[in-house]
Amino acid sequence: MIWHVQNENFILDSTRIFMKAFHLLLFHGSFIFPECILIFGLILLLMIDSTSDQKDRPWFYFISSTSLVISITALLFRWREEPIISFSGNFQTNNFNEIFQFLILLCSTLCIPLSVEYIECTEMAITEFLLFVLTATLGGMFLCGANDLITIFVAPECFSLCSYLLSGYTKRDVRSNEATMKYLLMGGASSSILVHGFSWLYGSSGGEIELQEIVNGLINTQMYNSPGISIALIFITVGIGFKLSPAPFHQWTPDVYEGSPTPVVAFLSVTSKVAASASATRIFDIPFYFSSNEWHLLLEILAILSMILGNLIAITQTSMKRMLAYSSIGQIGYVIIGIIVGDSNDGYASMITYMLFYISMNLGTFACIVLFGLRTGTDNIRDYAGLYTKDPFLALSSALCLLSLGGLPPLAGFFGKLYLFWCGWQAGLYFLVSIGLLTSVVSIYYYLKIIKLLMTGRNQEITPYVRNYRRSPLRSNNSIELSMTVCVIASTIPGISMNPILAIAQDXLF
């Protein structure tokens, strides 16, 4: 009898929860329409996978790519609408959030064709791979629009769980298993630290969880300059630091980059930084409004350490993926300059512009690494020697993307860094910008060292891997080369479209 009553109560509670969720989705679903498209794509993938055979594999790529493209289209149609707070204050829709969501969707759209040949050659499970990519994209999009502490915690956890599974996707690879274990342990520790910081912020504000209400709560409780806020700032900075991976929170990055499947690394290297940057700007700028001097100082230290350590250690690397891991640590140091400057001197606009260019430069480089790795089976930098003699297109594409990452004119990286450093200089960050300029010169050195190897034509320097280099007969080869071509073009000819890009970035503020 007791069991029967408990069962009825459980059914009633479940029904109420379902009706509440249905009510929220019915009245607020239009505010997350791009996200709903991805959810529909996920459900469709699961349905087709459970009712089809291996011959329908092309449909999986088509559904995933189409859902991402439609989601981008829906996002563009919503551009310039009035800011809206929905789901009882949990989610905010505005231009600033939407442009970061657009960048995440763009990353995922380019990463799927980049993964096709790799999946076919390694015989990875395709459906689960695409499901994890789409779910991680969904988590990143929700993080960009998160407006309360609970959503800011849950959304990155959705992204992180998929990231752990993707990094260990090749279960038979010992390096992949090692990378996954390090990533999981450090990710779990960082999440715990982040939640602890949120608890201090929650208590100091009098029990508020919405970002703007936290500010009002701190004013009402007179706790905005209390030690509790300083403790919250330190813990939250450490927690976000592991997501952004600046020095000294970068320990997991090289191992995960080296051990994970290359398309997964390409995906994580850009989407995680875009989503974490969007979240960091809102957390630091709104709840810690009264502690701006303190978090500016903390971020300046992180930026300096990242730019110096990332670029110096990258010089000594022998693996392309580890080199790009340390390079990404240096790159996030440049992005932090934009976060520090804020919207007073177009800091956010410069950060958004640079991240757009960074996506094309980084994904273009990883596309080249995927192709070379599949055709030779190596990742060693020295094994790239003489690639120009066998595949001029791949060698030139790699060279252009690397030069753009280094910031040489007239490539995209130059304009992105120029705008970013100029905004930092105008904001009075002279020392930070000087460090950025010096470390950019250092990065050009190790990029040029690789390009010299690519272009060498002397037989004694050409490695056996390049001598036996053969193009892949797979049709899917076209998809990865298409993705690579798009990234290379976006990395090389930004001067024509710089003014519209800057105008859009300047509009995408709070």
Curated annotation (Swiss-Prot):
This protein's major location comes to: plastid
Indicate whether Cytoplasm appears among the record's keywords: no
* Ranges annotated as spanning the membrane: 24-44, 59-79, 99-119, 124-144, 149-169, 183-203, 229-249, 295-315, 323-343, 354-374, 395-415, 418-438
EC class name: translocase
> Which reaction is the catalytic activity of this chain?
a plastoquinone + NADH + (n+1) H(+)(in) = a plastoquinol + NAD(+) + n H(+)(out); a plastoquinone + NADPH + (n+1) H(+)(in) = a plastoquinol + NADP(+) + n H(+)(out)
Task: Please give one Gene Ontology molecular function term for this protein.
Answer: NADH dehydrogenase (ubiquinone) activity
Asked if the Swiss-Prot or TrEMBL record annotates the protein with the keyword Thylakoid, the reply is: yes
Tell me the membrane topology, using the record's own terms. Multi-pass membrane protein
What the entry lists under InterPro entries is as follows: NADH-Q_OxRdtase_suN/2, ND/Mrp_TM, Ndh2_N
- Cell compartment(s), UniProt: Plastid, Chloroplast thylakoid membrane
Which BP terms from GO are recorded?
ATP synthesis coupled electron transport; photosynthesis, light reaction
Q: Which HAMAP family match?
A: NDH1_NuoN_1
Q: Its quaternary structure? A: NDH is composed of at least 16 different subunits, 5 of which are encoded in the nucleus.
Q: Which family does it belong to?
A: Belongs to the complex I subunit 2 family.
The name this protein carries in UniProt is NAD(P)H-quinone oxidoreductase subunit 2, chloroplastic
Q: Which organism is it from?
A: Ananas comosus
